[in-house]
Amino acid sequence: MMKNRVTNIHFVGIGGVGMSGIAEVLHNLGFKVSGSDQARNAATEHLGSLGIQVYPGHTAEHVNGADVVVTSTAVKKENPEVVAALEQQIPVIPRALMLAELMRFRDGIAIAGTHGKTTTTSLTASILGAAGLDPTFVIGGKLNAAGTNARLGKGEYIVAEADESDASFLHLTPIMSVVTNIDEDHMDTYGHSVEKLHQAFIDFIHRMPFYGKAFLCIDSEHVRAILPKVSKPYATYGLDDTADIYATDIENVGAQMKFTVHVQMKGHEQGSFEVVLNMPGRHNVLNALAAIGVALEVGASVEAIQKGLLGFEGVGRRFQKYGDIKLPNGGTALLVDDYGHHPVEMAATLAAARGAYLEKRLVLAFQPHRYTRTRDLFEDFTKVLNTVDALVLTEVYAAGEEPIAAADSRALARAIRVLGKLEPIYCENVADLPEMLLNVLQDGDIVLNMGAGSINRVPAALLALSKQI
């Protein structure tokens, strides 16, 4: 096993949300963990507080003494630490391969899907915790109740996100898997072929042993398309009563969702029960159904499921409520932060905001993520952005890409303006966004700060400015 052969593990890009969680769990398992990153952030500070050596920047000396070097997809092969490791014949592996090794220590539950992975993983961990199963978890966002995105539990299960963006989820060998949905995103990875995208998810499901079980959402058209090709045991979930687990009587109760769960899953007691989910949105009802399916499969009680969903405190940057901020002209606005950056998940989050806060004017501050995504989904972005009451667009977060003509925020603003409903406000520099928002907001508004790039710094800056008023 790895523990008998490996002592020192070095992470290149340790501050990334996927990397930091794995590093923390390995540290808690007793490995000597170190890492490096170009930028300090909350994750690197947290790891440092645990006693993990985190180096600023990347130099060859950082890998000296390492038994293995772990890299994120953002790390280039020209990185000096990667080059030095290869020269010293130190194995260099992707983070997904190290996550796969972690799953050798526990029974793995892997959550895949284009949207909803982080929330579903968090809900699953919450319910398993409420059931006394004390799971290990590695999540792509901070679980608010735990104050971290990873935790080493004493129980037999590890719950983790499975990343399809680079097909690295095919390294994992879980005993249970979830597919929340399949959408056409990260299509460069799949040669812009829907067939290859479908096959990757089929292969992911087939990574389970014969005694495993998958939970598949039949509300997703692409998931329904792969069902005939899935040969491993699976159960379906969704809002349709043909699913093995489905929901009815769905109600918005403020920022919560109340619904009835119906179970007609083979090998389980048939019946129904009511739950209250402590977060808004019909899309989160689906995420909760996936977590409920996994929980029932591992033997959690209905009471534990109800407790885990009602007590769920959310996850960082997934409809994360910061509370009211003061406005210069008097009054307050409710600040909510969200990671959404694909039109489908944005539409779901905006609908959740509308349902939870019916009387409020909805103001969206959005930073598109990647020029290629903006180009490929331009019309979809235009449609979803046009559904809010006021819109502030900041420039595309490139994520290492070169700009593409007519695939930037100015082009989006022009296209939305032509539709005649909104007059988008363009903010070229994200650093100027907090002050601009304070001048746009009105008393009683909800402002949704959304995107997967540097816009994540806006809430803290906006709160700081607001306190000076």
Curated annotation (Swiss-Prot):
Subcellular location field: Cytoplasm
Reactions catalysed: UDP-N-acetyl-alpha-D-muramate + L-alanine + ATP = UDP-N-acetyl-alpha-D-muramoyl-L-alanine + ADP + phosphate + H(+)
Enzyme type, top EC level: ligase
Keywords for this protein: ATP-binding, Cell cycle, Cell division, Cell shape, Cell wall biogenesis/degradation, Cytoplasm, Ligase, Nucleotide-binding, Peptidoglycan synthesis
Biological process, per Gene Ontology: cell division; cell wall organization; peptidoglycan biosynthetic process; regulation of cell shape
InterPro entries for this protein: Mur-like_cat_sf (IPR036565), Mur_ligase_C (IPR004101), Mur_ligase_C_dom_sf (IPR036615), Mur_ligase_cen (IPR013221), Mur_ligase_N (IPR000713), MurCDEF_pg_biosynth (IPR050061), UDP-N-AcMur_Ala_ligase_MurC (IPR005758)
Predominant cellular place of this UniProt entry's protein: cytoplasm
Disulfide bridge map: none
Listed GO CC annotations: cytoplasm
Listed EC numbers: 6.3.2.8
Role according to the record: Cell wall formation.
Similarity comment: Belongs to the MurCDEF family.
PANTHER family listed in its UniProt record: UDP-N-ACETYLMURAMATE--L-ALANINE LIGASE, UDP-N-ACETYLMURAMATE--L-ALANINE LIGASE-RELATED
Protein name per its UniProtKB record: UDP-N-acetylmuramate--L-alanine ligase
Species lineage: Bacteria, Pseudomonadati, Pseudomonadota, Betaproteobacteria, Neisseriales
Gene from which this protein is expressed: murC
